Amino acid sequence: MFKKLVFSLSVLTVLLSSCEKDLGNLGMGIMPSADILEVRIDSVSHLNFKYIPDNTDDTIRASQNFLLLGSYIDPIFGKVRSEIFAPLYFSNPVIDESKYQFEIVRAILKMTYNDTSFVYGKITNPLISIYQLIDSISVDDYRTLNFKPSHETLLLKKQIEIDLLSQTQADRIDTIDLPKSFITIIDNYIRKIDPKDAYSIDLGPDDVNKVFSKKFFGLHIRTDFDDAAIIKFRDLAIDIKVKIWDSENNVDTLTQEMILSDYVDRENYIYKQPLVKFELKPSSIITENIGKSNQKNVYIQPMKGYKAEFQFPDLDRWLDSSKVAINLAKLTIPIETKDTSDYKPIPKLLLYIYEKGGKYPISNCSFTSREINTNNQYEFFINDFMTYFLKKGKSSSEYRYEIVTPNNNLYANRSILLPENAKLHITYTKYK
């Protein structure tokens, strides 16, 4: 009996030592032999929200995502436009003039999509404007909000029909015949490429395209119809139809394809990648309330619009709780559920917490719509921040809290949050 008692006490000692070690990792070690543990639940209800413009880089690299093109009028955020900057390569070497004579007879822009393509806004046949870029665009230009190139030439405007109602998932291609002026431009550029460069043993197709891209800077494609939709295109290319004949006047036709290029000229600090940029013209609902706190609704607009900042003024009372270990800290933010049938729900929000003046977040987490329960709310778990907060002992006002949508979130839509009902739920262990 005595041996069993000694064994039981030994096991209990090991378990309590392990508990002390784990809680110590949270930054608040305890002495199990002296302290009484009690699990409690509390909440912080007064979160002070405001929304502000997100003026950071509004560029989406289409090579990593998809090509988003279109425009629409959001009932809250106003006019939103997505446009494409498309540098283009030849998929194979250009024609060798030393062997053939040639004539470009047709140029066709191909835009590929299917019924799974993302549509944001009302499905309407958009008016497409296609410009030729006259000069290269620097990295800094691309990173400028609402940037517009100063040197470009309008090639054409054309209304196209978008069919996203079919039940098939097969690719569909909308084609636009490019004008004679574009054919002349491409013809002149091809003839300026030295055949020695185009067919040198030391140069491959990419090297030839680098020569070509110094002469042809690509296309700028946008829609001029305000209340349409933003559509996700899977691909964009140009077919160049060419008639060739040899020294014996044998005639043939072939197709040279121009495809999207995908590299960065780091030496000259110039992008050679397809990029998507967004233009935003806010409505009065936004402009009248930017920066104001305690709004009934807080609007989060992705695709470079607006983000929310908030404060935890009631969080400082926890600084007096020196004998507390955080088990769970969950921030819940309800979502406005009014009808938005023309707009898909936002699938993701990101929460970032920074030290004031800090460039990089000390805590970050995300929440997607797939995880939204019947309570229609976002939930963020910030245990790591609460532990950090209690350990540092600084006021909550020394931190910056942001809710944003990711730049590359193609399926993003506006989010209408209800800050009055936002809460931070805290489950903790208290000992004394």
What does each model-identified segment do?
Residues 2-13, 19-432:
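Secreted, disulfide-rich extracellular signaling modules
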